[in-house]
């Protein structure tokens, strides 16, 4: 009960103060409140303007980052392909020498092909080589069908052109000859 009585007294005191103020004091009090409200509004307005400027800067920075990402997205891919180009150039130079043999040229081409395929795999490109597998119309395109006794129907007999996927998505289907 003591707490309740003291709370009632506190509630009455502000009312008494407000009633006991002179008009001049009321005016001064209201002016002070107005000044504080105006200052608070000004501070909030400044915060809003800074936030808007920060958002504009963020938009510009993000737009520039996206532009750079588009420009240089293939940078590492191109650098990796240059390795393959260098290998081809060395192969051509070697093939032009008088002592070059067909065997050496073929070995060089096979090595270059391996480098090329490993470069593609680094970037998520996987070769589809479906020889002796069942024909899959989602990954393979039948060039022709040949009756072949002793082979399962709809199995791939020969790969005419390899297919490729990029990160699991088909880029080019494998062109195949299928057993009928």
UniProtKB/Swiss-Prot annotation:
InterPro entries tied to this protein: GrpE, GrpE_coiled_coil, GrpE_head
A GO biological-process term: protein folding
Entry superkingdom: Bacteria
Subcellular compartments: Cytoplasm
UniProt-listed CDD domains: GrpE
Basic and acidic residues bias locations: 1-12
Keywords: Chaperone, Cytoplasm, Stress response
GO MF entry, a single one: unfolded protein binding
Pfam families named among the record's database cross-references: GrpE
Annotated GO CC locations: cytosol
Stretches the record annotates as Disordered: 1-31
SUPFAM superfamilies reported for this sequence: Coiled-coil domain of nucleotide exchange factor GrpE, Head domain of nucleotide exchange factor GrpE
Primary role: Participates actively in the response to hyperosmotic and heat shock by preventing the aggregation of stress-denatured proteins, in association with DnaK and GrpE. It is the nucleotide exchange factor for DnaK and may function as a thermosensor. Unfolded proteins bind initially to DnaJ; upon interaction with the DnaJ-bound protein, DnaK hydrolyzes its bound ATP, resulting in the formation of a stable complex. GrpE releases ADP from DnaK; ATP binding to DnaK triggers the release of the substrate protein, thus completing the reaction cycle.
PANTHER family attached to this UniProt entry: GRPE PROTEIN, GRPE PROTEIN HOMOLOG, MITOCHONDRIAL
Homology family: Belongs to the GrpE family.
Known partners and oligomeric status: Homodimer.
Protein name listed in UniProt: Protein GrpE
């Amino acid at each position: 009960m003591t707490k309740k009585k003291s709370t009632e007294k506190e509630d009455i005191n502000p009312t008494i103060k407000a009633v006991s103020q002179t008009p001049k004091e009321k005016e001064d009090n209201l002016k002070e409140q107005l000044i504080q409200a105006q200052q608070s509004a000004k501070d909030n307005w400044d915060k809003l303007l800074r936030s808007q400027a920060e958002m504009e800067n963020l938009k510009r920075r993000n737009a520039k980052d996206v532009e750079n990402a588009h420009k240089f997205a293939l940078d590492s891919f191109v650098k990796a392909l240059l390795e393959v180009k260098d290998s081809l150039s060395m192969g051509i130079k070697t093939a032009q020498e008088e002592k070059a043999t067909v065997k050496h040229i073929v070995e060089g081409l096979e090595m270059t092909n391996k480098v090329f395929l490993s470069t593609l795999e680094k970037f998520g490109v996987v070769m589809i080589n479906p020889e002796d597998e069942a024909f899959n119309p989602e990954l393979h395109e039948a060039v022709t069908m040949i009756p072949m006794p002793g082979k399962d129907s709809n199995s791939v007999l020969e790969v005419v052109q390899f297919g490729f996927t990029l990160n699991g998505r088909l880029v080019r289907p494998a062109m195949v000859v299928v057993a009928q």
